[in-house]
Amino acid sequence: MKRTSFAQFNCSLAQTLEVIGDWWTLMIVRDAFFGTTRFEAFQQDLGIARNILTQRLKHLVEQGVLERRPLTKGRKQCEYVLTEKGRDLLPVLLAATQWGDRWAPNRRGKRVVFVEATTGRPIVHLAPSTARGKPLRMEEIEPRAGPGASPEAKARFSLYSSS
C-alpha cells in the first residue's frame, strides 16, 4: 500500500517530509536558494512539467516555505521567494548535498561548492556537535523522548537510553 501522507505521525521528521518530502519540492527549494524566483526559470532549470511545478509551488506557498509576490501591480506575473521558514531549510540542503558528494559523486568533482560569500572560503562540513563545538560520532548520539512525545515513543526511547 502506498503512503500518501505522514500528517498523522507524531514525529518531527514525518512532519518535515509532509512539507518537503517530494523530490521536486526539494529541488524547487534548492533553486530558490540559488536565486531562482520566476516560474519560467524554475521550469527551465528543472525540466519539470508546468502542472507539477504549479502544484509544488502552491504547496510550498501554503506551507509557508515560499512567499508568492506580484512583480507589478495589476499583472499576473509573480515571483516566489523563500520565507524565514524556507531559509531555515538551508542546513537540510547543505547536508543532503554533502551526502550526495560522498555517496553519489561526480567523476569530475563536486557539482557545487558552498563558500562564505565575503571570503570565498568553503564552508565547514556540517556535522553534529556538542554545544561547545566538539564533533560527535553516531555512537555518541542517542534519541530521547521530548516533551511532545507520545506515550508509545517515550516507551520506545526508554529502551535505547543509556542513562
Task: Give the predicted meaning of each segment.
Residues 16, 26, 63, 92-103:
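Alpha-helical linker/hinge and terminal dimerization helices associated
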Residues 21, 72-93:
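Basic, amphipathic "hinge/linker" alpha-helix immediately C-terminal to the N-terminal HTH DNA-binding motif
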Residues 1-20, 157-162:
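N-terminal leader segment of winged-helix/HTH proteins
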Residues 61-76:
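Beta-hairpin "wing" of winged helix-turn-helix
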